[in-house]
């Protein structure tokens, strides 16, 4: 949360006149040059699959007046429910652009589904499911005339354990996040809807994300201070995968990067994104994230949302007075129109925002976004993000118990749901109800919500059994004949605020109260991020624990399928759960303003690449549940590790090649192949996520560099194969400004999680 009272106290001691740098800094001039300048902004080249789209776009833009070009670069108000809108150009049959939230379903409208959130997809560790979910979700956006989906999220990457938006992203690991964002981009865009991968870059906390005026004093956005090596090996990594997948837009974020605002940072926009990664699409602001006028255009920004007072006629004035080149405006317009052609939105695309009025309660055309063929994927995506972390004496699956008792506020659905209320500050909505999604612009508008209690009651109806429930008391009465007591709690998070803690006393007391009266207490946690469990995880009567994350509208159906054994849990943690909050060290809380930087809050990423499991490994800290951990109703055995180098004449640096989408294409050359065998050694069919970790010389102990989810019948064995490309095995050389293969021995680990790795080997380069 924003520590306003603490900030007021801090500002009380700040001199508002010029001060020495060793005291209170009062001018941002102190920070000039910390983010290197990269100019001019590169023009889109139409490389690869973009060639035809760019040819058409250039012909289109050549017909535009300067005012029409300018109008393409900023949003305007509209009568639609689109989050943002680019005005139409009727004389050229350009119908405008509707851009809308969110990464887990269309928000603020009706007749659409509420899909599982990013953290849930991350916990599934399933590439195919990620793509299918994205494809069907994109089709819903298409039917509603949405040109651009505002997502997926790969920043934040989960650096701060209490980060308020971590749940919108896939995981705390760049490789897993990159693999899943690649599939998501491809899936959504296969439907003819574009994505704007966000929030670029280093957007790792909500605290001080926007400038504020406190007690009459202006306070800038927090600055994420990241060195070049760290930005490449962690935070840029998944964006590179998104660009490689063809992401047509990238959304720049609110914060400053090395003390330059993200939406006018020429190093990250012109240098990293448009030059190094060869990005061909356009850069769009987060809402209200533009802080400079012509400077932001020259730095590589292409589109402002939801509107702007800093551009408009100022762009043409700047061209006239020489402070901006006419070619920059042409490139901005060309990039935007090229995406329209790239996605074939010039042909048979619905009217932008059709069936989406500004107010869902006003009269409007019925446009059904949902479709019958997506239902199985909707349910499967809800199922696979559940992670079973404890299951003593096979407490799960339930064996048709005659009496189940249900406790906890999270078991029931909300009394009402207002489609228009889900922007910021929705925590009261979920304090006493089941959590299917987090809060903020990343929330969604479900067609329905099947709460756990409803689904359990339906199961009892079908089985001819009984359910007792008390979902309001913290210390409920328990029928002593209950065969199982299910306790439902949650851990909410939202845009706009970081979490105040990773536990809460009310929920923990509820769990221990029930467990003291029931010797088969099963805890289900719907968690929008890391949730610590040390207060009750070792209680002898807590027999099973399911981290249910954010499943979307099919939450109850998915959970009951797992509880009753129709589905075998296969989720794995996409983050590390510590034994105690202090184990996260300096990365537990967001950075707060401190003297001498009270007016310019600083967040120093001094830990480098050591976040989440990398930090736990480095400091030899034993977690409660490690990254990649998750139980099943069956068991899996590993054997037969094989490591084969596929390129014996590997150079230290990648061979030179023309930059394409994603950067130097030689980064994707496969160098090593690792194979292993996985056997379902139990008696139940199930899916296992085989994980490959590599220890690169002079780097972290191990880093995820491959995973393969395989469905195996009881007793079945399958081979898993991992291809390691040049980027997978390289580290960023700051001096050479290239990915470099280290000389030495590379350690290889294959297994069930980041700390359960029965197969080990090595190879040398």
UniProtKB/Swiss-Prot annotation:
EC code: 3.2.1.21
Keyword annotations from UniProtKB, A to Z: Carbohydrate metabolism, Cellulose degradation, Glycoprotein, Glycosidase, Hydrolase, Polysaccharide degradation, Secreted, Signal
Protein's cellular compartments: Secreted
Signal peptide region: 1-19
UniProt entry tagged with the keyword Signal: yes
One GO location term (cellular component): extracellular region
GO annotation, biological process: cellulose catabolic process
Catalysed conversion reaction: Hydrolysis of terminal, non-reducing beta-D-glucosyl residues with release of beta-D-glucose
Positions annotated with a glycan in the UniProt record: 24, 71, 93, 126, 258, 314, 321, 432, 519, 541, 647
Pathway note: Glycan metabolism; cellulose degradation
Active site: 286
GO terms, molecular function: beta-glucosidase activity
Family, similarity comment: Belongs to the glycosyl hydrolase 3 family.
Function in brief: Beta-glucosidases are one of a number of cellulolytic enzymes involved in the degradation of cellulosic biomass. Catalyzes the last step releasing glucose from the inhibitory cellobiose.
Xref: PANTHER family: BETA-GLUCOSIDASE, BETA-GLUCOSIDASE M-RELATED
UniProt name for this protein: Probable beta-glucosidase M
Classification of source organism: Eukaryota, Fungi, Dikarya, Ascomycota, Pezizomycotina
